[in-house]
Structures are given as structure tokens and as C-alpha cells.
């Protein structure tokens, strides 16, 4: 079980303690850390919707440190990022791999960044299925559709031609923060807070 630091604040009504993530949520900062899976996606989506209801005109900051994970869970987060009114600024701290990189690139144009030593990795979706031959064929067709959708969205967000994305995601493709910026997955590399 991970330990979560507590923050104590003085208010006019006395002391109030928050876990660090709840305190940062008050500042419109959401952390996406670890594997992208359904429970995490539901929490991220709920936080995005909550912050939109609090102030639909103020940017939301999504900090990403993730090795990737479930495509469907990631798409729930991505679709919500695109759906809500506030811009979602994305920042890679540590790593944004696979679905993490997809979400990083899906931030608002001009508002996607990484810290200088962050790593970004894009690749094609992974899948495995066992069963009857006809069911395996159905799942193979579905993963190819998902691959095409992910590649189209990456092409849109990066400005790269679809054919280049298809080539570059055929195998694991690791990039430094600077390389990810040159590729179009992010807009800037942040060295120091201004």
C-alpha cells in the first residue's frame, strides 16, 4: 500500500488536513500515475468533470507518469479531455509510454509539455486472445480498428502524416523530451517554472 502525504492548512475555521492529491486538485492539478486501467480512468474522468463544473473557463493540469495500459480505459480519459470545455494542459513527469503518450499528445494544442529527462514511447496496441478461430479473427479485426483510430488521433495531434505514424508505431519507439517535441507529441520542454 502506497503512503500518501498529508498537508495541513490553516483556515479561518481552524486547521484542515488533506491528502496531497486532494490539495493539488484544489489547484486544478490531476495526477495520472501508474498503469492506465478502468478504476484509475474513472477517477481521472470524475476529476476532469468536477473541475469543469467548478470553473469551465480555467485550464486543468494533467501530470502524467505512466507506463501505459488499457486502450479502452485510456480512451475514456482522452474522450473526456476532448469533450470538456476547459483546456487540459498535459505535462510528462518521468515517463509517458503507450497510452500515457497518447494522453500526453491529446492535451490542448500549445499546452503540452515534458520535463527535460522525461521519456515518451509510442507503439501499436497490444492484445491477446484465446478461443475459437472465428472469435480470434473478430478480435484481430477489432485490434486493427483500434490501431487505426489511435494512429489517426496521433497524426492529428502531432501533425505527422498518418503513414509516418504507422511506421513509427510498428515497434516500441522511445523518445527523449526534446525528440517528442520535435516529433510534435508535445509543444515544449520545461526546465524551470517561470
From Swiss-Prot:
<keyword id="KW-0378">Hydrolase</keyword>
<dbReference type="GO" id="GO:0005737">
    <property type="term" value="C:cytoplasm"/>
</dbReference>
<keyword id="KW-0963">Cytoplasm</keyword>
<dbReference type="GO" id="GO:0004176">
    <property type="term" value="F:ATP-dependent peptidase activity"/>
</dbReference>
<feature type="active site">
    <location>
        <position position="123"/>
    </location>
</feature>
<dbReference type="InterPro" id="IPR029045">
    <property type="entry name" value="ClpP/crotonase-like_dom_sf"/>
</dbReference>
<comment type="similarity">
    <text>Belongs to the peptidase S14 family.</text>
</comment>
<dbReference type="InterPro" id="IPR018215">
    <property type="entry name" value="ClpP_Ser_AS"/>
</dbReference>
<dbReference type="InterPro" id="IPR001907">
    <property type="entry name" value="ClpP"/>
</dbReference>
<dbReference type="GO" id="GO:0004252">
    <property type="term" value="F:serine-type endopeptidase activity"/>
</dbReference>
<dbReference type="GO" id="GO:0006515">
    <property type="term" value="P:protein quality control for misfolded or incompletely synthesized proteins"/>
</dbReference>
<protein>
    <recommendedName>
        <fullName>ATP-dependent Clp protease proteolytic subunit</fullName>
        <ecNumber>3.4.21.92</ecNumber>
    </recommendedName>
</protein>
<keyword id="KW-0645">Protease</keyword>
<dbReference type="GO" id="GO:0051117">
    <property type="term" value="F:ATPase binding"/>
</dbReference>
<feature type="active site" description="Nucleophile">
    <location>
        <position position="98"/>
    </location>
</feature>
<comment type="function">
    <text>Cleaves peptides in various proteins in a process that requires ATP hydrolysis. Has a chymotrypsin-like activity. Plays a major role in the degradation of misfolded proteins.</text>
</comment>
<dbReference type="InterPro" id="IPR023562">
    <property type="entry name" value="ClpP/TepA"/>
</dbReference>
<dbReference type="InterPro" id="IPR033135">
    <property type="entry name" value="ClpP_His_AS"/>
</dbReference>
<dbReference type="Pfam" id="PF00574">
    <property type="entry name" value="CLP_protease"/>
</dbReference>
<dbReference type="GO" id="GO:0009368">
    <property type="term" value="C:endopeptidase Clp complex"/>
</dbReference>
<comment type="subunit">
    <text>Fourteen ClpP subunits assemble into 2 heptameric rings which stack back to back to give a disk-like structure with a central cavity, resembling the structure of eukaryotic proteasomes.</text>
</comment>
<keyword id="KW-0720">Serine protease</keyword>
